[in-house]
Structures are given as C-alpha cells and as structure tokens.
C-alpha cells in the first residue's frame, strides 16, 4: 500500500514536472511587449494591421523558435501554400498547389543602438504580421543573436513584382494557409504592432524597458523624421542571399525600388548601411518616365550619385534619346554623359544627331549643356561648336538662338545670329547681328515687358554704315500701356525711321513696305462711372506722324494734334424718365507745315428715348452739333473764327422673328430681323471751313446705319434719307453658334447730296444697295462677301468677296476678289495643301488687274519628318515705289533643338489665311561661345 502510494506520488510528480515543462514552452501572457497580446479568434478581423516601417529594419525577419541550423538549411524554397497572412482562413484546396517562389526583401531605415539586448530586442518585436513555415533556408552570415532581426523570405502564389506595382496592377490574392501553421512563430491574428503611432482608440503599448510613453513618442518622432529623408527600399528577385545589416544579393530578375527610383537587372547587390547598389546584366533604371539602360550600374540611393556603363537613355519630357560611353549620376536629376549622342528622332531613325564629347542634362531645369559638339544631318556634318547650351522642354532660357540664313535681291546673302536674354519671367530681350552682303552689318534689338498694370515693347534696329548708300540707317518702334490707378491710364507710341526708303530696302512683307504714316503719340485717359450704368471719359493726347512719301505717288501729310482734349459722357434713363443723355466734345489744336493751322472746338449733346420689348425696338434721337474754329491771323481764310451749328435727328427701329427648322438633318433656329433707319440733317454750307481730319468712309452696313458718312468733325453731311435693312441668321439649336448670315440693305435719299469733300462741291444723288453673306455654306466651305451697286447704272461700285475651303488642318484653299471702281481691281489666291503625311506645298498670288502686275507672289514646299522639317519658300514683293524685291527662305528645323536658316513662318502665316504650322511644335534655344 505504501509502495503503491509512493509510486502514485512519483507519477503525479512526474506529470507535474512535464506540465510545468510544457507550460514553460508556451508564450507568456504577460503585458510585456516581447510576447504581445493575442486577440481571440474572430475579434479584430476588420481592424488593419499597422506596420511602422520606420522602426522595422527588415520586413522579412522572423524568429525561428527552437529550429536548429541544420533544419533551417534543409529547404531553399518556400511553398506559397505555407504562407499565412493575418485574418485569412485556410483553403484546403490550396495545400496541393505548389508554385515557383520569388523572394522579396523590404528595407527601411534602422534605429542604431549600442546594445544588442536593448533597443535591438525591441525592434525585433516589430516584424511584419505574417506567419511563415519553418523549413526556411538560413542565409550565409554570422549567427543571429537573441533578439536581433534576421532575414527571412516571403513567397506569393502570383508574385507582384515591383514593375507591376509601378504599373498599378492589383496584387493577386494569396491562398489561405493551413490551420497547422497557427502555432508557428509570428504575430497573432489582429494583433497591433508595438511602437506604431497611436490613433484615437488604439491601445497604447510600451516598448520593453521603457516606462514613460512620452519618451516612446519622442523616439518615434525622431525615427519618423529620419525615415522622411529616405524612402523604404524594396527588393524582389528569384533568389536573395546575404544579411540585412550588411549586404543583400539579389539573383535572377532582380528589382529594387526606392520612392520614384526603380532599378532592374539580372544580378544586384544592395548595402543597407551605405545605401550603395550595384547591378550587372541588362540594367534598367527608371524615374518619372526617364529610362536609362546599360550593362553595369553603381548607384547610391541617398546621394543619387554613381555611374552606368554603356548606357542608352530616353527622356520623357523631351521625347529625346541617345547613347553614351558612360553616364554619371551627379545628384538628384543631374546626368552627365561622356562620348554621347542626342536626338529627338524615334528609335531606328538617326536623321539628325548631336555628337557630344561631354553632355550634362539638368532634368530640373530641362537644360542641356554640351562640349565639343558636332551636328550631323543625314550623316553629313552641318555644324560644329565647342560649346552649346539648349532647352529640351520648350521653355524660355537665355542663350544664342540658331543662326538664320537667307537671300534677298535688295540685301544680298544674309546671316543673322540672335541672342535671347530671359531677364525675368515678365521681361526679356533679343539681340541679333545681321550680316548682309549688299548692305553690311545691322544690329537688331527687341525688348518686351509685361507687368501687372503695364506692358511695353521696344524695337531698335541700326545699320551703322549701309554699303549701298554710305549712310547710317536706323529704325525704332516703341509702345507702352500703363494703368495708373484711380481710373487713369496712359499709352505711348513712337515710330520712326532714318529715311523714307528704309522699309523698302529692309522690309520683307507687303504690310511693312507699304507703310506711309508712322504714329507718334502720347495719350492720357480718365474713366469713371456715372451711377450704375453711366460712363464718363476724358482723353488728352499729343499726336504727330512721320510720313513716308512715295516719289511716284505723293500723299498729303496729316495734321499734328498739339494737343487734343476729348470728353464723352453717357447717362441712360436719366431720373427714371427713360431718356438717355449723351455728350461728346473735343478741343484740338491742329498744326501743319504747309496748310491752314488753327484750333477747333466741337460739342455734340444728344438725347434718345429707346423703347424696347422682346420682339423689337424703336429709338428716336435728337442732337445738336456745334463746331467753332479759331484760325488766327494770316491763315489765308475769309473768316478767322467760323462756326457751324447743325441739328441732327434720327429714328432707328427694328423687329426680330425666329422659327425652328431642320436642314440637312440638323436642327437650326432661323431669325428674320428687319430694320429701318431714318436720318435728317439740314444743309449748311461748309466751303469756308478748313478740313483738318474728315474723309469719306467706305460704304458698309455700319455706314448705312450711321448719321454721318464722313469721318472726323469738319464735314457733316446733309441728309434726308431712309435705310431699309433685312438680316436673316441661321443658328445651331444645340449651341447657339451662328452658322450663316445673309443681309441686304437699301439706302434711299430724298434730296440731292450737296456736301462732299471735293471743291467745288458736286451733287451726289445715287441710291445705294448693299448685300452681304458670311458664314459656313458647308462644314468645310466658308465665305465673306459683300456687294455695293449703283442702281442707276446697274453697275457694281464695290465688291469684296472671299471664299475659303478647309477640309482638315493643313489643307486650305482661299480665293479673294476686291474691286472698287476707279481705285483698285485685284484677285488673291492662296493655299496650304498637305499631299501626304510628310509633303505639303504653300502658294499665294496677289495680282492687280488694274495695273497688270503681281503685288505679291509666293511659292514653297515643306517636308515634315517625325523629328525634323525642311521649308523652302520664294517670295516676290512689289514695293510702294513700283519697284520689286525677291527673297528666298530655306529653313531646317530640328524638333526640340533649333531652327537653322531663314524663318518663313511669319510670311506664311500673314500671306495665307488659315495656315497652320505642321511638324515641330517649337524649337529650343542654343547658346554658344
């Protein structure tokens, strides 16, 4: 019995020891952060696992428990089925599906410590919340001490490579692990990781050995600031080996990603301590669209310095590419290429190439700087410079523009080298040296300024010594607008040339060579409101002109205004009566070297009573026009202070009808707008009055509905006439856009018109009829045509007609006809036509049927390749002196780099309505020695 008791007690003692031993093998359930707190099954499934990558040195370390080193070496790969992610349930079907693994390694900045038993032990607590199988190969390296993070691998059923991450692909779902994996080392399901920043409602955790949470927060803040300086580093490869604290080697389809930087190669090494990366075999570096490829790479992720051997490169912003013997990384977005090439042509097309001994690309400023540059076009060297600076983004920058070449019959061969100075974002300057074989050297300057309340432009050209005339010749043009505040604004205009033939000798377009009066003016204006809807304006100006005379067709020099003060005031609905009151007036002192001088005072008060509703209006108006002259003694006139007073009465009325209609399957709104305008002005003899500024206006719809057919204030017509006008418009119902407008007008005078500009005055009683059509006849054909007829003789007095055919961008045909009886008779045809993706022609012919000569002729051809364009244009221009000049333009444009030769684009855009530039969308600036 005693023996049985002793035996039973022994068995109980043995069982107690075994139970204690088993108890010792379980993780303790204390509050210490080393063990963590297990969450009951089912709780926290919806709560995210927060990982503080800042405090975790290796996301793929795990504690191997009691496994021996030999057990760790027993397997080199991990089956995807053995991975258990938090909050995932087991999938029995997944156990029998092996997959080829790819090892991943994630690095982030570590917190350095002096002790392996202190903070290092704490950091090991923050491993990724993932349960891993035990059969993992231990990588070569020093044995990990207790608490020190060790490298571990991660496998996925469908590995999401870093390149897939860059493309934004969603990761494939990983099969759920078997339930047998639940007791393996790792964090429990739904467990919060100690040390992350606590959000509202999070349970506060303390690191081992720490008692004050404030100290924890301070350490976390310091660690977070350190992490901000360097993005986490992710490494993916077929096989990883090495040690987290030292060097990691990735073998087979290796990929490294750190922020926007992405590197891939066949083989790669990464040292976390120094942040150095080395890669060999099919190296590819990507950053924000830039792609660099080479054979060997050495790169520091922190300093962004290193080198890439035998690289090819493609820049996203510039759409450029090239090759080099060596590429040096010299900091963030700074590349230096040695023995390099540069082009914007696509791969396989080297139509033009910059061959450079040393090329530096500043990817922040988008500027390239090259040394010892040779430019080849179609394998033919066309330019060499020891130094070049260019923008590959199209933005403004200081530097030399590409030289321009050209030829003209009056200037000879030309070469111009312009320099652009980008002084500030709101003002710049361009200086150009222009060498002409027949004229010598010309210096051209342009300055532009744009301020918040002002803007300016200055042109200054000089030929120090014209080889033809042996004189100094020059031109200046300046304008400035300025808002002074409080309703005041000012404008200055000054234009002058050294002689009357300057534009004929140096101009290259008809508008320039036919200029006759160059404006010189200073203006000060004051504007304010009168009540809610009234206006008040006072203007003062000083004005004169430089008149460029044609020896074969002399013109009268305009009067100078020294000065002129004008007043305009308008007040609608005065005192709520519905009456609109208007007052206009001026005082002007006119000066002329050969004609009558004097001053003129003009006052024109008027009142109108507009009546309007939804379908029409009627507006009676009455005014009194008063004019007084002070001609002074010796003016050669019969009266020194003549005056004129004229009452003016008008009645304007109109109706508006509309209807819905369908035309060609489209829905339109058609309007019908009849209008009747009557004006009465009694006759007053005006022969004794000087004519300072009056001229006859061109007959048009606007002039038909005006009270005076003369401009200025010296001549006021006698009138007792009525104008009938009818307008119909076709509006798109969906957008309200006007598709077509038709209008006819007839002016009927009840008296003989006795006031004319001629002396002696003649009677003019001819009734006038006008018709006009404008808009789109079809989606591709538009017109703007007007006719004025003499109904007595059934002859056209004025014809203006223009038709344009534009089926698509780059294809346009224009035809124009202009006729004014006894004045001009011209035809004008122009075209830009793209025959293929690359070839197009341009042409213009402006011919005078009255003079039987070509006013302007132009013909050219353009070839647009994908990365370069070539333009050749011939221009024949008739000058105001009945002489002519011929110019040739030849330009080679290298897309994204420069334009070489004389630029015909300004001539083409002015001469051919609807011309659009095809090929390059801009060229850069170059800067030379």
UniProtKB/Swiss-Prot annotation:
Source superkingdom: Bacteria
Record key words, sorted: Cell outer membrane, Membrane, Signal
Polar residues: bias regions: 154-164
Short name of any one Pfam family annotated for the protein: LptD
GO BP annotation list: Gram-negative-bacterium-type cell outer membrane assembly; lipopolysaccharide transport
Subunit structure: Component of the lipopolysaccharide transport and assembly complex. Interacts with LptE and LptA.
Protein's name in the database: LPS-assembly protein LptD
Organism, as annotated: Nitrosospira multiformis (strain ATCC 25196 / NCIMB 11849 / C 71)
Gene that this polypeptide is encoded by: lptD
